Amino acid sequence: MKIKVVTVGKLKEKYLKDGIAEYSKRISRFAKFEMIELSDEKTPDKASESENQKILEIEGQRILSKIADRDFVIVLAIEGKTFFSEEFSKQLEETSIKGFSTLTFIIGGSLGLSSSVKNRANLSVSFGRLTLPHQLMRLVLVEQIYRAFTIQQGFPYHK
């Protein structure tokens, strides 16, 4: 199995990079792992709704270019489905059983995700109603992916 995480924007904070690197290394025991950072569009101060939509579409096209036809795509969106960690683990396991060899997670930029990206998704997941910086969400996501694998393997990490 291959896990891809496609994100918009460059990660600058060392503590987040270190955490992501640690969990990426741990995930690699279970699956091939790849983090893809795409450049974000500069959003003007007090941008109009049409300017925001144009930015979303440009970023959306960049995201879609990184998704293969056979990828199972999971977008992170506040309106998505919430899971307990055990349910999330089961979802990932079932996706693999259904024959998908690549799981692609998508984290949008500060404006979110375009409708074209959301429409391409096989599943929309929410980690709750809280608003988190998308940079921090990367770390939360890779930790939960690692946790999902440890649940599947019966490791004591998840208690």
Curated annotation (Swiss-Prot):
One of its GO terms (molecular function) is rRNA (pseudouridine-N3-)-methyltransferase activity. It comes from the Bacteria. It is found in: Cytoplasm. Its EC number is 2.1.1.177. InterPro entries: Alpha/beta_knot_MTases, RlmH-like, tRNA_m1G_MTases_N. It is an enzyme of class 2 (transferase). GO terms for cellular component: cytoplasm. S-adenosyl-L-methionine binds at residues 76, 108, 127-132. It holds the Pfam family SPOUT_MTase. It catalyses: pseudouridine(1915) in 23S rRNA + S-adenosyl-L-methionine = N(3)-methylpseudouridine(1915) in 23S rRNA + S-adenosyl-L-homocysteine + H(+). Keywords: Cytoplasm, Methyltransferase, rRNA processing, S-adenosyl-L-methionine, Transferase. Coiled coil: none annotated. HAMAP family: 23SrRNA_methyltr_H (MF_00658). Belongs to the RNA methyltransferase RlmH family. Homodimer. This is Ribosomal RNA large subunit methyltransferase H.
